[in-house]
């Protein structure tokens, strides 16, 4: 299994890159539009990869952001969600927006992704509602510590996640104080 590739980008399309390694081997990787926006032809880069081996193909999907990779891997495990649909979701939603949509049961967010209808949106939410979501790891450490502290005080994760992005503090203790004012 190939988990990461380092090389120089020799070809770049909106959702696909070719990386040439130091050994001279070139690999084609499908990438999200978010990842594509951060890459340039000729740039040396290391991409984390997810490899999917099918009867007719051996496909590589590349990620700069490990949370985006986790989101992709979580999605491809769901019934009726293939790699193309999962990559479309990764191209439309950040890991944080994805987590918030699942936590809040926001089917409209998923329906805004090309190729996702109401049934698929509801299925994603239903199947992932109990999963450990990405938002815990996609926020800075002090925000995650504040989230855990507020949960320990008995507040619901859904309410905390909704207000957390609006808070301005940059330390755990200040963030908890600010959150308590909003949650009370």
Swiss-Prot record:
Residues 144 are annotated as: Flexible linker. Its main location: cytoplasm. Residues 1-64 are annotated as: Domain I. GO terms for cellular component: cytoplasm; Holliday junction helicase complex; Holliday junction resolvase complex. Pfam families: HHH_5, RuvA_C, RuvA_N. InterPro entries: DNA_helicase_Holl-junc_RuvA_I, Hlx-hairpin-Hlx_DNA-bd_motif, NA-bd_OB-fold, RuvA, RuvA_2-like, RuvA_C, RuvA_C_sf. It is found in: Cytoplasm. The keyword DNA-binding applies. CDD domains: UBA_RuvA_C. SMART domains: HhH1. GO terms for biological process: DNA recombination; DNA repair. Residues 144-184 are annotated as: Domain III. Keywords: Cytoplasm, DNA damage, DNA recombination, DNA repair, DNA-binding. The keyword Isomerase does not apply. Residues 65-144 are annotated as: Domain II. One of its GO terms (molecular function) is four-way junction DNA binding. Belongs to the RuvA family. Has three domains with a flexible linker between the domains II and III and assumes an 'L' shape. Domain III is highly mobile and contacts RuvB. The RuvA-RuvB-RuvC complex processes Holliday junction (HJ) DNA during genetic recombination and DNA repair, while the RuvA-RuvB complex plays an important role in the rescue of blocked DNA replication forks via replication fork reversal (RFR). RuvA specifically binds to HJ cruciform DNA, conferring on it an open structure. The RuvB hexamer acts as an ATP-dependent pump, pulling dsDNA into and through the RuvAB complex. HJ branch migration allows RuvC to scan DNA until it finds its consensus sequence, where it cleaves and resolves the cruciform DNA. Homotetramer. Forms an RuvA(8)-RuvB(12)-Holliday junction (HJ) complex. HJ DNA is sandwiched between 2 RuvA tetramers; dsDNA enters through RuvA and exits via RuvB. An RuvB hexamer assembles on each DNA strand where it exits the tetramer. Each RuvB hexamer is contacted by two RuvA subunits (via domain III) on 2 adjacent RuvB subunits; this complex drives branch migration. In the full resolvosome a probable DNA-RuvA(4)-RuvB(12)-RuvC(2) complex forms which resolves the HJ. This is Holliday junction branch migration complex subunit RuvA. The lineage of its organism: Bacteria, Pseudomonadati, Campylobacterota, Epsilonproteobacteria, Campylobacterales. The gene is ruvA.
């Amino acid at each position: 299994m190939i988990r990461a590739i380092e090389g120089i980008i020799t070809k770049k399309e909106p959702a696909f890159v070719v990386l040439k390694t130091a050994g001279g081997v070139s690999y084609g990787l499908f990438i999200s539009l978010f990842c594509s926006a951060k890459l340039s032809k000729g740039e040396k880069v290391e991409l984390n990869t997810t490899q999917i081996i099918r009867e007719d193909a051996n496909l590589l999907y590349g990620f700069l952001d490990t949370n985006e990779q986790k989101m992709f891997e979580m999605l491809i495990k769901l019934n009726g969600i293939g790699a193309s649909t999962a990559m479309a979701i990764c191209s439309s939603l950040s890991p944080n927006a994805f987590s918030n949509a699942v936590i809040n049961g926001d089917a409209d967010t998923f329906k805004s992704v090309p190729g996702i209808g109401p049934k698929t949106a509801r299925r994603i939410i239903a199947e992932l509602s109990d999963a450990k979501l990405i938002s815990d790891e996609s926020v800075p450490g002090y925000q995650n510590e504040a989230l855990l502290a507020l949960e320990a005080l008995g507040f619901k994760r859904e309410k905390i996640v909704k207000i957390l992005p609006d808070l301005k503090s940059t330390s755990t203790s200040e963030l908890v104080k600010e959150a308590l004012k909003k949650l009370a």
